[in-house]
Amino acid sequence: MRIALCSYSQKEKETALLMKLGKVDRFDNGVFCTYAMQRDGPYDAVVVMEDGARGMNFCMSIRGYSKDVPLLWISDQAEFEPQSRRMQADTFLVKPVTEYQLREVVSRLLQGKRGSNESGEEEKYE
C-alpha cells in the first residue's frame, strides 16, 4: 500500500506508524504530492497532518487532482471540521490522535471504507 503524508514538519512518530501499514512518501507541499500521483498513480490513502489554512491548502491540492483518493485530515483545530467536509476529506481527526485512532482510520481508508460508518455519515474523532 502507498500512503502519502502531507506535512510541513517532520512527523517521525506518525511516519513510523504509517510505515507499518504501507510505503510512506512525505510531502511538504500539496503540489508535489499531486505531481507524484500524476507521475506514479494515485496513493491508496493521503494523510494531511497540518492545522488550519495549511491543512486546507493540502486538501484543496489533493482534491483538485483526485476526488477518489481516500483523504484523512488531522488538525488541532476542531473548528475546521466543517471545512474538512467542504474539502471532501473522508475523515477528520482532532489532535491529539492516539496511535490506535490513526491505525484504525488509515486501515479503514486502505480497505476502501473511506471513513464512512453504517449510515454513510462521516466519522469524526476527538
Language-model regions: role of each:
Residues 14-15, 33, 39-66, 77-78:
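Conserved phosphotransfer microenvironments
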